[in-house]
Amino acid sequence: MEIIPPRLKEPLYALYELRLRQGLTASESRLPRHIAVLCDGNRRWARDAGYDDVSYGYRMGAAKIAEMLRWCQEAGIEMTTVYLLSTENLQRDPDELAALIEIITDVVEEICAPANRWSVRTVGDLELLGEEPACRLRGAVESTPGVAPFHVNVAVGYGGRREIVGAVRALLGKELANGATAEELVEAVTVEGIARNLYTSGQPDPDLVIRTSGEQRLSGFLLWQSAYSEMWFTETHWPAFRRVDFLRALRDYSMRHRRYGK
C-alpha cells in the first residue's frame, strides 16, 4: 500500500523542489562548476515498466538528457559531462546496439541544436561506432560555438583506461617526433603531460559525479579526472530522474567539505 496517495505526489514533489531551490539560493550554497553524470538504468526502467523492447527505455532516457542539461544551465553550472556509451556497451547484442547508437546520435544532434547555444565536445573514440554515426556526431558538434557560457561533453565510445593509455601514447609520440632520448621520454611522463593529452584537455575536472540506478562505482568513467570528485548515488533509474533528485545532489554537494586527498 502506498503511503502517499498518487494525487498528492506531484504537488508534494513540487513543494519539495521549491524548498530545495530556495534553500540553495538563500544560503548562497557552493555549487559545482563541473558535473559528470552516468545515465544508468534505462534497460532496467523499461523492464520494470513492463516493456519487452528495452530500446523504449533508451528513448525515454534520451529525452531526459536535454532536460537535465537545462537544469544544470539554470542552476549556473558551467560544464556537464554525460556518459552515453562506453566501450563495454559496444559488446551488446548487435540489434540492441544499433538502436542505441541511433538514439544517441539523435540525442547529440538535439543537444547541438543552434537554439541551445551550448558548446559541445565529444569525448571518446567515435571510430568505434561506424562511419555514418561518427560523421553525424562530428558534424553536429562542429556546428556548436567554440566558446559559450555552458559547455557539454558527451562521452560516446568512451573507456577510462583506453583514454589514459591513449594519452600516454600521444605524449610519447610527440616527444619521439621531437627527437627525445629514452631518458627524456621517461621524464616527459608527468601528471601535467598526461592531462594535456586526455579527451578533456584544458577543462576542469568534475567536482561532482552523479550516478543513477543504484550502482556505486565509476565503471571506467573519467577515471583520471574524477580522482577527487565528490560522488552522489541514487536508486532512481535514469528515465525517472527528476529535478528534485538533481537539486538534492546539489544540496548534498554544498554540504560537503572537499579535502582533495589532504
UniProtKB/Swiss-Prot annotation:
Binding site for Mg(2+): D40, E230
Documented EC number(s): 2.5.1.68
Catalytic activity reported: isopentenyl diphosphate + (2E)-geranyl diphosphate = (2Z,6E)-farnesyl diphosphate + diphosphate
Keywords: Cell shape, Cell wall biogenesis/degradation, Magnesium, Metal-binding, Peptidoglycan synthesis, Transferase
Keyword Secreted: no
Recorded coiled-coil stretches: none
Cofactor: Mg(2+)
Cofactor annotation remark: Binds 2 magnesium ions per subunit.
Annotated active site: D40, N89
An example Gene Ontology CC term for this record: plasma membrane
CDD domains recorded: Cis_IPPS (cd00475)
EC top class named in words: transferase
GO molecular function terms listed in the Swiss-Prot or TrEMBL record: ditrans,polycis-polyprenyl diphosphate synthase [(2E,6E)-farnesyl diphosphate specific] activity; magnesium ion binding; Z-farnesyl diphosphate synthase activity
Pathway stated in the Swiss-Prot or TrEMBL entry: Phospholipid metabolism; decaprenyl phosphate biosynthesis
Gene3D superfamilies named in the record: Decaprenyl diphosphate synthase-like
Binding-site residues for substrate, renumbered to this chain: G41, N42, R43, R44, W45, S86, T87, E88, R92, R211, R217, L218, S219
GO annotation, biological process: cell wall organization; peptidoglycan biosynthetic process; polyprenol biosynthetic process; regulation of cell shape
InterPro entries for this protein: UPP_synth-like, UPP_synth-like_CS, UPP_synth-like_sf
Function comment: Generates Z-farnesyl diphosphate (Z-FPP) from isopentenyl pyrophosphate (IPP). Z-FPP is the precursor of decaprenyl diphosphate, which has a central role in the biosynthesis of the mycobacterial cell wall.
UniProt similarity note: Belongs to the UPP synthase family. Z-FPP synthase subfamily.
PANTHER family on file: DEHYDRODOLICHYL DIPHOSPHATE SYNTHASE COMPLEX SUBUNIT DHDDS, DEHYDRODOLICHYL DIPHOSPHATE SYNTHASE FAMILY MEMBER
Name of this chain's protein: Short-chain Z-isoprenyl diphosphate synthase
Organism: Mycobacterium leprae (strain TN)
